[in-house]
Amino acid sequence: MSYHSFSLEPKYENTMLSQRFKEIDKLFSTLSGKKIISDSVPPYDILQLKENFYKLIVSVPGYLEKNLEISTQYDQLIIIGKKEITENTNEKKETVEKILHQEIYTGDFSLSFRLNERISVMSATLDQGLLTIYFEYQIPEKQKIQKIQINVK
């Protein structure tokens, strides 16, 4: 299971240092023949729609609604994808002798996001290989800005 903290703070991962770690990870996976850890997790984006509304988009090409499960428990959002290898999606089955290059992940995956107690999951949609989950960040009345009218006498 891959665990991510869902925060409304921007996350800066595209730094020179993080790129170096990714390159080192790829180098060791090439030498050892083992799969890169980050390759078993589908890519995702977190976008702000309005002041208190957000959406999480997870790239899940080839997964059907029946292959995906979304749940919340305590302060976690859990997304599980299970894809049967023998599943025929109207494509002609071919025998593959050797995979020369593979970037499209097609196996099982699990993503977990820690949710702030004020974040509520509103809905989820699956459209053209993109799983979109909508969130609302609820601000308590006491913390909202209250404008006080000034009366002139």
UniProtKB/Swiss-Prot annotation:
Pfam families attached here? HSP20
Residues of the signal sequence? none
Domain sHSP: from-to ranges: 35-153
Q: What is this protein called?
A: Small heat shock protein ibp
Bilayer-crossing residues are none
InterPro entries (UniProt xref): A-crystallin/Hsp20_dom, ACD_IbpA/B, HSP20-like_chaperone
> Which family does this protein fall into?
Belongs to the small heat shock protein (HSP20) family.
Q: Which PROSITE patterns match?
A: SHSP
Q: Which PANTHER family match?
A: PTHR47062, SMALL HEAT SHOCK PROTEIN IBPA (PTHR47062:SF1)
- Mind telling me which Gene3D superfamilies this protein's record contains? 2.60.40.790
Q: Which gene is the coding source of this polypeptide chain? A: ibp
Q: Does the keyword Translocase apply?
A: no
